[in-house]
């Protein structure tokens, strides 16, 4: 195999998404992996598995294996096995639900236990979801950032509903795992709202203005 063939090979990363039920984990992963947003809440039983390939600076192709872990698995026998081997862990909470933030301590305790047993240290990111509901926020950004600083987490705020910063979150996590620095232009481009309308043929489409231009919501409302 030539050097060029080796260089063109994909890197693969296992990213595990943890947090309470209804924190928006599945909406977050589907918005990223499938560019859709489901209006109806459907509880994840066990886990869901998603794949998406992205390109990082230097034309590095990276396939993200995203493990969306059901919120009810905390304390379950399989949780350790789901986390094992992950290069990245996303701790997701709902910024309007204080308990979902408090319970991340329990999720992180399991991550630390698995890390100690496997002698590997995944990158851990704290993800505040549902920023489209800023007016209902119950967890102040300062508390979020303090939790990050105390534990060495990377910090992210996203909206799975609008797509705001969803791609950027996964992109930054993958880049940080691989030691790649994103420049300002790449970050700004990834912050754009994901274009991923859900088509419902039983309803008349509604027009809406979205900023920035030429982008749209992960859900049609």
From Swiss-Prot:
Pfam families per the record? Ras
Q: According to its UniProt record, where is this protein mainly located?
A: membrane
Q: Which InterPro entries match?
A: P-loop_NTPase, Small_GTP-bd, Small_GTPase
Stretches for region Switch I: 35-49
Subcellular localization, per the record? Cell membrane; Cytoplasm, Cytoskeleton, Cilium basal body; Cytoplasm; Nucleus
Give yes or no: UniProt keyword Cell cycle: no
Q: What is its EC number?
A: 3.6.5.2
The UniProt subunit note reads as follows: Interacts (prenylated form) with PDE6D; the interaction promotes RAB28 delivery to the photoreceptor outer segments. Interacts with KCNJ13; the interaction may facilitate cone outer segments phagocytosis. Interacts with RELA; the interaction contributes to RELA transport from cytoplasm to nucleus.
This one is known as Ras-related protein Rab-28
Native species of this protein?
Homo sapiens
Q: Which gene encodes it?
A: RAB28
């Amino acid at each position: 195999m030539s050097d060029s063939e080796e260089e063109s090979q994909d890197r693969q990363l296992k990213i595990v998404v943890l947090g309470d039920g209804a924190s928006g984990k599945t909406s977050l992963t589907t918005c990223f992996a499938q560019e859709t947003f489901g209006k109806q809440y459907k509880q994840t039983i066990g886990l869901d598995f998603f794949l998406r390939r992205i390109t990082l600076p230097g034309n590095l192709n990276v396939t993200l294996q995203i493990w969306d872990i059901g919120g009810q698995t905390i304390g379950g026998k399989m949780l350790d096995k789901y986390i094992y081997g992950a290069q990245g862990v996303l701790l997701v909470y709902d910024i309007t639900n204080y308990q979902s933030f408090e319970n991340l301590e329990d999720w992180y305790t399991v991550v630390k236990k698995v890390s100690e047993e496997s002698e590997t240290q995944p990158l851990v990111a704290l993800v505040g979801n549902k920023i489209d509901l800023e007016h209902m926020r119950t967890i102040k950004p300062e508390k979020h950032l303090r939790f990050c600083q105390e534990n060495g987490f990377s910090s992210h705020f996203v909206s799975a509903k609008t797509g705001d910063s969803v791609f950027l979150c996964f992109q930054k996590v993958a880049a940080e795992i691989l030691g790649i620095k994103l420049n300002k232009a790449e970050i700004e481009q990834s912050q754009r709202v994901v274009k991923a309308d859900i088509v419902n043929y039983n309803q008349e489409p509604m027009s809406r203005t979205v900023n920035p231009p030429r982008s749209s919501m992960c859900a049609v409302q």
